[in-house]
């Protein structure tokens, strides 16, 4: 009896082992199938990605203006590969069409249609974030004018004249602007003046109009310079945003000498400072004191921008003026004043809000520098700086 029980126990163990051994290959087979499925999906995904890359590369190479250099091909990549930074023309929906006055459909020109950096190999024409730097010879005026003629756009221009700046500069500024600024398009000149009785009589082009506003006089010219950010913002909110498509803000102590046209239009436009456009960022006169809201540390910064000219859409200029004035107020609380006042805050703003278009020094040139070979056509020139005559405190 004992022997029979022992035999039965041995048979149970043998059967258990047999079942275990037969189930083990089945488990391994299932795992292998899962691994093969995962590998198959990975291979399929790689094939899809490779196909997309090849098609995209063919698209880039199909653009006729793009050269063989890698940086040029990078520059022409569609805007969604540009970290959200575009020019005005790129920011609109591609292929958008506008109806012309004669009933034809006119396609909005893309950046590569009107801008050719290869025409000026002697200068920097594209920023690291792929925004155009507009130099004489890089833009197609006829193509741009053909498009903007259908848009019936209006461009605004703000200028401040207080104290002795009125007699010394305002009339020359307005008369030259009437001659060269946005020729053939509607323009509104917004003149901010501290004494309207001293406003010069200026006869304007039929497409141009003038709005004069009296502002409070400040004791210090530094305060006048900084308060203009607040004033511009207030006027944009009150009426300018409803009156113009683009807005430029300029200093009064300069004079137009050549066409300042639609090639300058953009969402956020900055002006290179004539004295610093060839310098390295380490030499820029940024605000270097950490306590100031305009502080830019060494090792940071792209260009040095001139506050004498900046522009863009009303919304973008409103944001710019608000942020700059916020920084000015913050500095006042800390009893500090940025080295170059509103210009220091402007440079800080452009550090974190990259301009979509930059104007070369030809658009704001100082003849005291001379006339180097890369300056082909001076659009706006500095007037003689007679600070001892026009400023209350120097």
UniProtKB/Swiss-Prot annotation:
A GO cellular component annotation in the UniProt record: Golgi cisterna
One MF term in the entry's GO annotations: N-acetyllactosaminide 3-alpha-galactosyltransferase activity
Transmembrane segments: 42-60
Glycosylation sites: 83, 319
Ranges in the topological domain labelled Cytoplasmic: 1-41
Domain remark in the UniProt entry: The conserved DXD motif is involved in cofactor binding. The manganese ion interacts with the beta-phosphate group of UDP and may also have a role in catalysis.
Protein name according to UniProt: N-acetyllactosaminide alpha-1,3-galactosyltransferase
Organism of origin: Mus musculus
Lineage: Eukaryota, Metazoa, Chordata, Craniata, Vertebrata
Gene name tied to this protein: Ggta1
